[in-house]
Amino acid sequence: MSAADPIQDNKSWTVADSAALYGLDHWGHPYFSANANGHVQVQPRGDQGSCLDLVELVEELKSRNLNLPLLIRFDDILEDRLERLHSAFEEAISKYGYAGRYQGVFPVKCNQQRHVVEQLVESGRQWHFGLEAGSKAELLIALSLVNDPEALLICNGYKDQRYIETAILARRLGRQPVVVIEQPDEVERIIRSSQELGAAPFLGVRAKLTTRSTGHWSSSVGEKAKFGLSVPDLLATVEALRQADLLSDLRLLHFHIGSQINDIAVLKDALQEAAQIYVELTKLGAPMGYLDVGGGLGVDYDGSRSASAASTNYSLQNYANDVVATVRECCKPHGITLPILVSESGRAIASHFSILVFDVLGTGTVPGAIPKQTVEEPLTIHNLRETLSGVMATQKGAVSEISRLQEAWNDAIKFKEDALAAFRLGYISLPERALAEQLTGACAEAIMGQLPCNETIPDDLQSLRAVLASTYYANLSIFRSAPDTWAIEQLFPLMPIHRLNEEPTQLGHFADLTCDSDGKLDRFIGNGQTKTLLELHNLRQNEAYMIGMFLAGAYQEVMGNLHNLFGSTNAVHIRLTTAGGYQVDHVVRGNTNSEVLEAMEHNPELLLERLRLASELAIQRGELKINDVRRLMDHLEASLRQTTYLQG
């Protein structure tokens, strides 16, 4: 069946079947589900509030000249994530009788977009929610936006003299920056800056924990971790601060064991180790007061609630309970004041709030049609036809026939290889080579259709799924919109956002617009395991096929690059209205071709002028007519004003 053929509806297929197939009810809860129309719907306030039909929303945004690919940010989801985080800690503090409070910060590196950071600061004001900065530019953002004197500004990363002095002086602006010492050589600069300015800093230290972590971010802990002080370094830092009369300004202990903690047991071990270090620091004379447990509050990308790389074996409430209970258990026997608990939970806050919607431009499929037999055909072609006839005569679904089907597929592969060898030697023509490929595809399709259900299938026949898979050409750049899928093999939920009341009859993967073989999406979630093919629908003429990438609101936008000069996509901020509708709060236009050219130091006007002059010469030579030149220049000028992606 060709990918362009009209689909034959399976009347028994339901929306619930699609939701189960794509795991929507697991990773999507409580924000995403499927409605009776077979569309993905969004509940921006989770279990409360109204729903938005995602397909209808996209169509209305397209009518506003916001073409795909389109990044849709739901501000209500961002606020809801913040509320759920604080509610979880408030419940845990109440449950365990913790004589302290929780005060979070958002790591700006997760998503530096202005509207995102501004909204988090404003929405978090009631909890004195702050920001974490890891560079001078991020520090500038944090200092300018957070004007709450009780909110924390955690200053991480490498720090030169100017960074340190900026943080110290900002205290006089009514800000509360915490300079976290992460490298031994920062101590001397901090002491010198404090003495020269005559101002006391608010200090923290980051400890290198020995707790063993798992997954991609396991290098965040241990002796070879990029950041943090070893125990000897911690002791040396305390002594240096004591000698400089700055030990009274050491108020915070920070640790970080990875951006995504999959296993709650790892967190418990880290908390026990960090809490003991905290206790020891108080014994050494530091007043302390804050324990920053870092990031790592994970996202269940595949919905399996397991310790796999794309999941977490705990809930948000489990996480808060373990942080509160473990710190209380470790600190209370020593009679010290329980610390204010801080977390840098950027991934858990930002992942859910944005959806990338892109369209499919076309498909590439294995030729499966059976070509008509010609009078004289090479032996390799004849052998393939005989193999196909044998498969067609096999009893469908018979377990006893599996070995015959396996033999037939091995024969088909061998005969195809014979045909390719004959072509290289000039014994068969190009049309005959094409015939061999078509017959091999027909064999694969026929064998796949004869395999029995619910039986163990040999590995060689399992590979038929990949052989028959289609390539769906996506109107996006993964290097711009989902770089982690390429860089660290991150899994994000992908699924059609419509036609969920139809059974998907194709298996496929996605290829992006870039001229790069790595520009593909070929790893998908599936029942707690990774699969290389996704169930998709046939394309229909004159009808867009729209795919959603979910849970990608953290890191992807800020880490994307200009590979092949594909720039940022159009983006919108959506907010629910009291009447149950929505309003577009902000529109962020995607990069135009002119903008990405300028980013690479090209002058668009100069490029146009060169082409105009070349066109004039072509007119003089009689190679172009004036009307053709006008059309060419119109196209070029329009392209400079358009986004870098293909237009429908």
From Swiss-Prot:
Q: Provide the residue positions that the database annotates as binding substrate.
A: 291-301
User: Which Pfam families does the protein's record reference?
Assistant: Arg_decarb_HB, Arg_decarbox_C, Orn_Arg_deC_N
Name the species this protein comes from.
Answer: Prochlorococcus marinus (strain MIT 9313)
Q: Corresponding gene?
A: speA
Outline what the protein does. Answer: Catalyzes the biosynthesis of agmatine from arginine.
- UniProt KW Lyase keyword: yes
Q: Which family does it belong to?
A: Belongs to the Orn/Lys/Arg decarboxylase class-II family. SpeA subfamily.
Concerning PANTHER family, the annotation shows: ARGININE DECARBOXYLASE, BIOSYNTHETIC ARGININE DECARBOXYLASE
Q: List the disulfide bonds.
A: none
The top EC class, named as a word, is: lyase
- Name the chemical reaction catalysed here: L-arginine + H(+) = agmatine + CO2
* The enzyme's E.C. designation: 4.1.1.19
Q: Which residues carry this modification: N6-(pyridoxal phosphate)lysine?
A: 109
The processes (GO biological process) annotated in the record are: arginine catabolic process; spermidine biosynthetic process
User: Per its Swiss-Prot or TrEMBL entry, what cofactor is needed?
Assistant: Mg(2+); pyridoxal 5'-phosphate
Name-wise, this protein is Biosynthetic arginine decarboxylase
Q: Name one GO molecular function term.
A: arginine decarboxylase activity
